């Protein structure tokens, strides 16, 4: 059953330690089965590990990582005349941060370190220095958008 009105966006409160909404969303993405305290512990412990190991500001490292991984273009599938085309579209800021956090978390969970704290700390530090699996994912997304540039005239925004 369709909605009469668009769903309202939930207001997400900023995290307690750094007063950041982006970090709060990142913690929510780490969270599994409603265990927010555990997710916060993982993120803040990873921040402590970054601070001790690399002697840099962990919050600044996190912001750099998110900024570096955030994509500017992605492809969306558009059906035109019985054929599906991969059309490059711009990514708005909120979706960009959502994709970046998802890619960083997935890349971290696939790393070989034993604990998620170590995995996350390493992946965040690498992403802040434009290295790592999450950066590769962003570059692949941009390459895909660049390869399908010819279909940009099928942009879904123009078709409505």
Curated annotation (Swiss-Prot):
Where, if anywhere, are coiled coils annotated?
none
* GO terms of molecular function: rRNA binding; structural constituent of ribosome; tRNA binding
A Pfam family that the UniProt record links to this protein: Ribosomal_S7
Top-level taxonomic group: Bacteria
The protein's matches in InterPro entries, at most eight in alphabetical order, are given as:
Ribosomal_uS7 (IPR000235), Ribosomal_uS7_bac/org-type (IPR005717), Ribosomal_uS7_CS (IPR020606), Ribosomal_uS7_dom (IPR023798), Ribosomal_uS7_dom_sf (IPR036823)
Name a single GO cellular component: small ribosomal subunit
Q: Which CDD domains match?
A: uS7_Bacteria
Q: Name one GO biological process term.
A: translation
Sorted alphabetically, the keyword list is: Ribonucleoprotein, Ribosomal protein, RNA-binding, rRNA-binding, tRNA-binding
Q: How does it assemble?
A: Part of the 30S ribosomal subunit. Contacts proteins S9 and S11.
Question: What function is annotated for this protein?
Answer: One of the primary rRNA binding proteins, it binds directly to 16S rRNA where it nucleates assembly of the head domain of the 30S subunit. Is located at the subunit interface close to the decoding center, probably blocks exit of the E-site tRNA.
Query: Family assignment?
Result: Belongs to the universal ribosomal protein uS7 family.
Protein name, as recorded:
Small ribosomal subunit protein uS7
């Amino acid at each position: 059953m369709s909605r009469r009105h668009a769903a309202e966006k939930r207001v997400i409160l900023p995290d307690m330690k750094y007063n950041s909404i982006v970090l709060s969303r990142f913690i929510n993405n780490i969270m599994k089965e409603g265990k927010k305290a555990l997710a916060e512990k993982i993120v803040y412990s990873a921040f402590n590990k970054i601070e001790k190991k690399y002697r840099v500001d962990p919050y600044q490292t996190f912001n750099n990582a998110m900024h570096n991984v955030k994509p500017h273009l992605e492809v969306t599938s558009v059906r035109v005349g019985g054929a599906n085309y991969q059309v490059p579209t711009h990514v708005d800021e909120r979706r960009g941060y959502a994709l970046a956090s998802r890619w960083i978390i997935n890349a971290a969970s696939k790393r070989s370190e034993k604990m998620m704290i170590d995995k996350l700390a390493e992946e965040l530090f690498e992403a802040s220095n434009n290295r790592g699996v999450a950066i590769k994912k962003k570059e692949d997304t941009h390459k895909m958008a660049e390869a399908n540039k010819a279909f940009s005239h099928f942009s879904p925004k123009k078709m409505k």
